[in-house]
């Protein structure tokens, strides 16, 4: 092998056994290896999967790099297999040995040091092998600031991942890795650290999620052959240790702050599946309802359909409600291969910010009940959430304002605006069991129903079938702020809104002789529809935005 040749070796683990092979030149053992074109993460993953004959339906959990060799540049990677393979791709017989059994064998000189490390009784002995152990450790962090946890200042405060690094590297003493299995494989628990912001309003302060919860990166080629229960999303995130810290007053975003003062406020196990650990602290458990799980699975199916059809370049966060596919990378420009070889923007699964806020408010506020528009959750087994909600409005299509008001036995007040009239009627169609929140800039309203969290509700007025006003999505911010924004970053408010937002649009047609005439007898409800901006239209909006900024 030339000096420039590169190779990787697999320290492959299945429970208490490790994968070894016999050297063709002697009776000594070695760790299986394969040549790689580069030490880039995708090349390493592809090579190890080929070596260990991992198919698209089987997830090889590749953990951290353990060591680097000298002459031939082998790099050792800890891997976790779903099952014990019998043969490698090159035909070599697989030998599975415990640490004690490994000690009775001779090893090739190149692998002797690594074998000694693996045979050590302390090798990869995590104290967090159960969900209970992870949770108890997480609970001990509640009430502490990041400064109190990382009192030696080992983590860089300027790093965007500083809070997560402090919890993972310092508090849990967990090494940095990019593993496709959960962070604590034996416990099947993924660790996530997420901010809480305080939102002030006339009704008093309330806690909101500071951002979406970004989960694992989507491998389009692999995910195209999976179903929900075999997907990387399910394997990685079935159980999430969610640790949340108080960050800031939401309106103070952008001001200088000392991240070391962030304080851990909550620690919960977000469980999407059942588990049996009788000593687990039940007050730390967040179990998702059947309805929520069905909505998450529907969202996954929506994303999956685009992946299967090699249309990942058309994905946006706005097309789903709870689980979404968000852009991945510092400038949102990274590309990943689809199953047909075409490249699309790299994306990761994420829980939307509105869903995270809804979860948070279940235990951070005194109000624990949320209105649901879906009365029979069995409907979600064969119908989309959107279609069920639209059923509330379909019976009123084609009816005038007066007819709708008469059906609900009320009279439309004469001293309210047309927009107020519109939403009053919408509220009655929904059964008058939701509350309406109005945007300060009058851009949209939102309903507090569980299924409409995070959805912007807009009206589209027509005059004899033609739009009578523009579809306003956002007020123009301060111009000095605008010129400092960059489209492909999180600080571009318009891009974030178009990429992440789903709208519920109500169409009303004014059939009066004069557009200013608001006689309710001649204004008709034409219907409702959910809408998000397609990726192709977002690209057009980008060009217009850049021209305006320049």
Question: Model segments located where?
Answer:
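Conserved N-terminal beta-strand and adjoining loop/helix that marks the start
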Residues: 1-19, 37, 75
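Nucleic-acid endonuclease domains
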Residues: 93-94, 121-185, 190-550
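Active-site segment of metal-dependent pyrophosphate-handling enzymes
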Residues: 5-6, 45, 49-85
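Anionic group-transfer/hydrolysis microenvironments
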Residues: 11, 24, 100, 192-194, ...
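Conserved Nudix-box catalytic region and its N-terminal flanking loop in Nudix hydrolases
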Residues: 13-55
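Short, charged/polar surface micro-motifs in flexible loops or helix N-caps
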Residues: 15-18, 26-27, 81-85, 195-197, ...
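A generic fold-level signal
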Residues: 3-5, 13, 71-72, 89-91, ...
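Nudix hydrolase/Nudix homology domain
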Residues: 26-29, 76-78, 86-126
């Amino acid at each position: 092998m030339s000096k420039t040749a590169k190779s990787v070796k697999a320290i492959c683990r299945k429970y208490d056994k490790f994968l070894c092979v016999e050297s063709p030149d002697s009776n000594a053992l070695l760790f299986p290896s394969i040549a790689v074109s580069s030490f880039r993460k995708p090349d390493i993953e592809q090579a190890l999967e080929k070596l260990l004959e991992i198919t698209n339906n089987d997830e090889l959990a590749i953990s951290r790099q353990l060591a680097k060799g000298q002459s031939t540049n082998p790099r050792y990677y800890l891997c976790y297999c779903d099952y014990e393979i019998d043969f490698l791709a090159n035909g070599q017989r697989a030998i599975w040995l415990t640490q004690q059994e490994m000690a009775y064998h001779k090893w090739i000189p190149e692998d002797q040091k690594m074998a000694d490390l693996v045979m050590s009784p302390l090798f990869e002995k995590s104290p967090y092998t159960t969900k209970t152990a992870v949770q108890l450790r997480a609970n001990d962090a509640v009430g502490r600031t990041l400064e109190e946890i990382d009192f030696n200042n080992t983590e860089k405060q300027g790093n965007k991942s500083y809070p997560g690094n402090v919890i993972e590297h310092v508090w849990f003493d967990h090494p940095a890795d990019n593993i496709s299995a959960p962070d604590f494989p034996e416990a099947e628990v993924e660790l996530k650290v997420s901010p809480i912001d305080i939102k002030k309003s006339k009704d008093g302060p309330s806690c909101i999620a500071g951002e979406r919860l970004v989960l694992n990166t989507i491998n389009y080629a692999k995910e195209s052959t999976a179903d929900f229960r075999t997907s990387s999303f399910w394997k990685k995130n079935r159980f999430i240790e969610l640790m949340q810290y108080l960050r800031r007053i939401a309106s103070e975003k952008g001001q200088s702050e000392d991240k070391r003062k962030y304080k851990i406020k909550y620690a919960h196990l977000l469980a999407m599946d059942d588990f049996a650990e009788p000593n687990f602290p039940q007050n730390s458990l967040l179990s998702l309802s059947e309805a929520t799980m069905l909505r998450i699975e529907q969202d996954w199916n929506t994303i999956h359909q685009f992946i299967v059809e090699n249309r990942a370049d058309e994905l946006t966060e706005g097309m789903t409600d709870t689980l979404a596919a968000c852009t991945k990378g510092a400038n949102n420009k990274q590309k990943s291969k689809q199953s047909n070889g075409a490249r699309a923007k790299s994306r990761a699964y994420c829980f939307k910010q509105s869903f995270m806020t809804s979860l948070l408010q279940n235990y951070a506020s005194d109000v624990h009940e949320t209105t649901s528009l879906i009365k029979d959750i069995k409907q979600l087994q064969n119908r989309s959430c959107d279609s069920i909600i639209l059923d509330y409005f379909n019976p009123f299509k084609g009816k005038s304002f007066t007819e709708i008001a008469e059906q609900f036995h009320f009279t439309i007040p004469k001293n309210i605006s047309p927009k107020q009239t519109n939403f009053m009627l919408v509220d009655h169609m929904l059964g008058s069991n939701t509350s309406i929140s109005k945007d300060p800039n009058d851009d949209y309203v939102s309903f507090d129903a569980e299924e409409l969290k995070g959805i912007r509700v807009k009206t589209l007025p027509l005059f004899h079938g033609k739009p009578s006003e523009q579809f306003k999505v956002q007020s123009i911010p301060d111009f000095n702020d605008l010129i400092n924004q960059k489209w492909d970053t999180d600080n571009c408010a318009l891009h974030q809104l178009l990429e992440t937002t789903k709208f519920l649009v109500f169409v009303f047609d004014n059939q009066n002789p004069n557009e200013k005439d608001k006689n309710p007898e001649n204004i008709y409800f034409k219907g409702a529809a959910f809408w998000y901006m397609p990726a192709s239209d977002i690209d057009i909006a980008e060009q217009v935005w850049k021209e305006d900024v320049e």
